Amino acid sequence: MAYPFQLGLQDATSPIMEELMNFHDHTLMIVFLISSLVLYIISLMLTTKLTHTSTMDAQEVETIWTILPAAILILIALPSLRILYMMDEINNPALTVKTMGHQWYWSYEYTDYEDLCFDSYMIPTNDLKPGELRLLEVDNRVVLPMELPIRMLISSEDVLHSWAVPSLGLKTDAIPGRLNQATVSSNRPGLFYGQCSEICGSNHSFMPIVLEMVPLKYFENWSASMI
């Protein structure tokens, strides 16, 4: 999860988030190299008193700086498209959970089970126990099995919302009348926090998301106790 004065991304917990972090580093390296080269050329031209006759009109140079940026953009676009297809692909999900956004809480329905559904509200600050996180704790966590592909069906009952869990690389819009889907998969157990990422009204900041990723056996015991 995030911590105060954090400069980097949250620790990756899913394969998608690992790919996104690698792509971020890949793109940042390209941007750094281009920026360094441009700044070096600008400083060189500003500090030297010599002027090359072909600096202002050189067909070869213009050809190079047309082809080179195109090649760089392709190097950025190809891994980006690959990740987009990975995020959209859902093959044989082990579990399907329907998520509905409301003003200002989330409701969840485990479609593979009968009568396994609940609402998830933020716990007010005055009701927090020692060690719990302000504005992030909920009364009902979403318990899911780890190391399995899980399909989330996301929509909204009223206005636009966005279901986002940064450490899992998830951010999917909840749109009234439309059903979006996302894949959830965690490499390790733990609690993973998120929030609504679309301004949805006065209490937009008060609809957190808490995923509890657990081993399959623990999930089976939990689901049996909830039915």
From Swiss-Prot:
Mg(2+) binds at residue 198. Binds a dinuclear copper A center per subunit. Its EC number is 7.1.1.9. Residues 46-59 are mitochondrial matrix. GO terms for cellular component: mitochondrial inner membrane; respiratory chain complex IV. The chain crosses the membrane at residues 15-45, 60-87. PROSITE patterns: COX2, COX2_CUA, COX2_TM. It is an enzyme of class 7 (translocase). The modification Phosphotyrosine is found at residue 218. One of its GO terms (molecular function) is copper ion binding. Pfam families: COX2, COX2_TM. It catalyses: 4 Fe(II)-[cytochrome c] + O2 + 8 H(+)(in) = 4 Fe(III)-[cytochrome c] + 2 H2O + 4 H(+)(out). Residues 1-14, 88-227 are mitochondrial intermembrane. Keywords: Copper, Electron transport, Magnesium, Membrane, Metal-binding, Mitochondrion, Mitochondrion inner membrane, Phosphoprotein, Respiratory chain, Translocase, Transmembrane, Transmembrane helix, Transport. Cu cation A2 binds at residues 196, 198, 200, 204. Its cofactor is Cu cation. CDD domains: CcO_II_C. Belongs to the cytochrome c oxidase subunit 2 family. Component of the cytochrome c oxidase, the last enzyme in the mitochondrial electron transport chain which drives oxidative phosphorylation. The respiratory chain contains 3 multisubunit complexes succinate dehydrogenase (complex II, CII), ubiquinol-cytochrome c oxidoreductase (cytochrome b-c1 complex, complex III, CIII) and cytochrome c oxidase (complex IV, CIV), that cooperate to transfer electrons derived from NADH and succinate to molecular oxygen, creating an electrochemical gradient over the inner membrane that drives transmembrane transport and the ATP synthase. Component of the cytochrome c oxidase (complex IV, CIV), a multisubunit enzyme composed of 14 subunits. The complex is composed of a catalytic core of 3 subunits MT-CO1, MT-CO2 and MT-CO3, encoded in the mitochondrial DNA, and 11 supernumerary subunits COX4I, COX5A, COX5B, COX6A, COX6B, COX6C, COX7A, COX7B, COX7C, COX8 and NDUFA4, which are encoded in the nuclear genome. This is Cytochrome c oxidase subunit 2. It comes from Lemniscomys barbarus (Barbary striped grass mouse). The lineage of its organism: Eukaryota, Metazoa, Chordata, Craniata, Vertebrata. The gene is MT-CO2.
